[in-house]
Amino acid sequence: MISGILASPGIAFGKALLLKEDEIVIDRKKISADQVDQEVERFLSGRAKASAQLETIKTKAGETFGEEKEAIFEGHIMLLEDEELEQEIIALIKDKHMTADAAAHEVIEGQASALEELDDEYLKERAADVRDIGKRLLRNILGLKIIDLSAIQDEVILVAADLTPSETAQLNLKKVLGFITDAGGRTSHTSIMARSLELPAIVGTGSVTSQVKNDDYLILDAVNNQVYVNPTNEVIDKMRAVQEQVASEKAELAKLKDLPAITLDGHQVEVCANIGTVRDVEGAERNGAEGVGLYRTEFLFMDRDALPTEEEQFAAYKAVAEACGSQAVIVRTMDIGGDKELPYMNFPKEENPFLGWRAIRIAMDRREILRDQLRAILRASAFGKLRIMFPMIISVEEVRALRKEIEIYKQELRDEGKAFDESIEIGVMVETPAAATIARHLAKEVDFFSIGTNDLTQYTLAVDRGNDMISHLYQPMSPSVLNLIKQVIDASHAEGKWTGMCGELAGDERATLLLLGMGLDEFSMSAISIPRIKKIIRNTNFEDAKVLAEQALAQPTTDELMTLVNKFIEEKTIC
């Protein structure tokens, strides 16, 4: 069996189609002076062909995925046609007498390597996008064949060293049942696209292309993160049964789509979705989300060469507001920094970026960024039920300063005659121990809290969740973390406010009953987790959950706490 990184869930059965292109061989010989013009023309001609191909892919991506994914390929075209890139390549041809392919390879590889050296995991994975563009350019310069994935005629499971975003956008979805790659990560554009399409995918296997041949029969189990190669009939029958069970469970859960998240004894909470773009709203609605508990606006700031303008942001926020209709959308202001840097911003080199210049600290230092974003959100609030949420808050002073800024921008919009929601709600992320311990004071300043358990856990336990050596210490169900969460919920309720949660813990089935019993008002998670969490809530009594929470929070260790929770779940047969 083969395993890797589970990129998109599902189970598929089919023959393997191994994607292998002609090897790109770079001609590194020195050219003569009278060959320079010819090589420059080879580069420009190859670039023109590559740009035309990307225009076609961009159009198809827009039709299949929506405007946000179309914008990815608009970015690819912009990079390919970038004047500085052109000048660098032509300079190498003219000054160093390099061939067109050698010059293009050196410049593109230099850009990709620079991205890989960054600490930011997201930007590291953008190196694959740059190499995707470079590979297409080189194949056109060299006159090599480019595989047309949209022309696949048989039902297959794709096996490749890697699938680039442009290749993924070309997939014939009636024929491609899923894909497996040697490389890739869960946050790559390819993985994100697979989830958008609900196409089973496992990436980062390391060696699937060396273990699979064309026409091998595969079972892609992207539920348990396993790939079976030429399995026995017994294994096939067993996995068919698993597939039927998964499909049956999915169908049963789908029946809950339009039902409220209400317990057997009548206590109701909200189950919402975390989104990154307007395209995600469709999946949220399909899975029964009752709103958007976290709209991550930082994706608007990524995959581009400059900060988005107020108008660009307004268009994006308006699209989400209109797509969600009467449902509330919590718009988190830009959460950049930490593990998410922007190549066009001058980030300082920091010993610990998670404790440094990030999120609201950047916005308060760079008021023009804050102004553009808040004005855009306010203007979009005229088209739906938007709420504003600030990340990385540690003090009441910050909240008061931010509210003053909002009032300034509101007055600007009034003076300009631009509509907005005068009573728009303002909330904060509680993701630092500082915010949690002064929650009783913060609750007087805002309309709601949303607990970010990923960072709250990391900061409370002093554990870098990206450090494999101590990752076992990262325990969101630690009594210390859970008692802080309870303190925050109680503080908000004492002021007549509500508390939601948008961290990974909100979608953790083992934590649902505990959080419910602690009084959490809103659970926000990946859309795909919503049906199962809603089922758990609808199958329990709120009073039982409160008893569980009281007992669990009194436990001294995580193991004892989890033993209690697991016993309760088994006895109630809830999950």
Swiss-Prot record:
Cofactor(s) of this protein: Mg(2+)
Catalytic residues in the record: 189 (tele-phosphohistidine intermediate), 502 (proton donor)
Family, per entry: Belongs to the PEP-utilizing enzyme family.
Residues that coordinate or bind Mg(2+): 431, 455
Main location: cytoplasm
Highest rank taxon of the organism: Bacteria
Phosphotyrosine PTM positions: 122
GO MF annotation, one: metal ion binding
Annotated compartments: Cytoplasm
Taxonomic placement: Bacteria, Pseudomonadati, Pseudomonadota, Gammaproteobacteria, Enterobacterales
Record's protein name: Phosphoenolpyruvate-protein phosphotransferase
Subunit-structure text: Homodimer. Interacts with the pole-localizer protein TmaR. Binding to TmaR is reversible as long as TmaR can get phosphorylated, whereas binding to non-phosphorylated TmaR is very strong and shifts the equilibrium toward binding.
Additional free-text comment from the UniProt record: The reaction takes place in three steps, mediated by a phosphocarrier histidine residue located on the surface of the central domain. The two first partial reactions are catalyzed at an active site located on the N-terminal domain, and the third partial reaction is catalyzed at an active site located on the C-terminal domain. For catalytic turnover, the central domain swivels from the concave surface of the N-terminal domain to that of the C-terminal domain. Enzyme I of the sugar PTS has been shown to phosphorylate NPr of the nitrogen-metabolic PTS, though much less efficiently than it does HPr. This process may link carbon and nitrogen assimilation.
Ways its activity is controlled: Inhibited by oxalate.
Record Pfam families: PEP-utilisers_N, PEP-utilizers, PEP-utilizers_C
Name of the coding gene: ptsI
GO biological process, any: N-acetylglucosamine transport
Protein's job: General (non sugar-specific) component of the phosphoenolpyruvate-dependent sugar phosphotransferase system (sugar PTS). This major carbohydrate active-transport system catalyzes the phosphorylation of incoming sugar substrates concomitantly with their translocation across the cell membrane. Enzyme I transfers the phosphoryl group from phosphoenolpyruvate (PEP) to the phosphoryl carrier protein (HPr). Can also use (Z)-3-fluoro-PEP (ZFPEP), (Z)-3-methyl-PEP (ZMePEP), (Z)-3-chloro-PEP (ZClPEP) and (E)-3-chloro-PEP (EClPEP) as alternative phosphoryl donors.
PROSITE patterns, per the entry: PEP_ENZYMES_2, PEP_ENZYMES_PHOS_SITE
Effect annotated for changing residue 122 to F: Is not detected in polar clusters. Is completely diffused throughout the cytoplasm. Does not affect function in sugar uptake or interaction with TmaR
Keywords: Cytoplasm, Kinase, Magnesium, Metal-binding, Phosphoprotein, Phosphotransferase system, Sugar transport, Transferase, Transport
InterPro entries for this protein: PEP-util_enz_mobile_dom, PEP-utilizing_PTS_enzyme, PEP_util_AS, PEP_util_C, PEP_util_CS, Phosphohistidine_dom_sf, PTS_EI, PTS_EI-like
